[in-house]
């Protein structure tokens, strides 16, 4: 859905809903399947309420498809798209880890997921990554870039203690959703936002950003990685 539907049916908002349902009535649409994630399911709920309020006999059905895996489905079932995204992401992550091991380097990669860390965690777990950073880790403390960098540095140091001079970290893009405006401004990140008010994270190279900051911190600590 390219446009977020208003939460009520009053005034001009009602006109918008009437325009949508005029199309349904014109083509006698009685079954409407909407495939998507959180915003799409929100749209399904609003259209269903309007159909019930206006007495239009229609079945509006939401099909939960999102790689974020953040829709509460019965029996904790994963959303459509999550497992395939995790599998494909794991293929890439394994290749990155092989490169790290054979070259003696550390690499940082990011995974999609908006405000949820399921995809990053699933990929990292499948590939036994030594460091996985997801927003859910910070449920009792504000997320800051410094904390994320400290986590990665600690993983590097711990592996060096056991003579493992390589590794990889996967970071969920969701951490960007939880950063304060002051934190974002201090690091020079400027987001554009979509019609639903979500930052367009695809336009920012998260992995390169954290890799650059990690390099700076390691240089300050005189750790040659």
Regions picked out by a protein language model, each given a short descriptive name:
Residues 22-23, 31-36, 42-57, 74-224:
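Accessory alpha-helical/coil subdomains and C-terminal extensions
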């Amino acid at each position: 859905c390219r446009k977020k539907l208003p939460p009520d049916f009053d005034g001009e908002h009602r006109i918008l809903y009437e325009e949508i349902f005029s199309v349904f009535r014109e083509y006698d649409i009685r079954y409407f399947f909407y495939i998507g994630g959180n915003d799409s399911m929100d749209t399904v709920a609003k259209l269903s309420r309007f159909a019930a309020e206006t007495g239009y006999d229609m079945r509006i059905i939401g099909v939960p498809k999102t790689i974020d895996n953040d829709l509460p489905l019965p029996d904790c079932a994963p959303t459509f798209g999550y497992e395939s995204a995790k599998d494909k992401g794991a293929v890439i992550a394994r290749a990155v880890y092989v490169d790290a091991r054979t070259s003696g380097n550390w690499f940082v990669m990011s995974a999609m997921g908006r405000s949820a860390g399921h995809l990053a965690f699933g990929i990292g777990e499948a590939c036994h990554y030594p460091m996985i950073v997801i927003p859910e880790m910070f449920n009792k403390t504000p997320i800051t870039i410094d904390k994320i960098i400290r986590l990665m540095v600690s993983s590097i140091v711990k592996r060096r203690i056991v003579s493992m001079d390589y590794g990889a970290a996967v970071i969920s893009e969701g951490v960007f959703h939880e950063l304060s405006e002051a934190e974002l401004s201090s690091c020079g990140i400027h987001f554009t936002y979509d019609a639903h008010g979500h930052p367009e994270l695809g336009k920012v190279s998260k992995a390169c950003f954290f890799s650059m900051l990690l390099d700076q911190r390691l240089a300050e600590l005189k750790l040659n990685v």
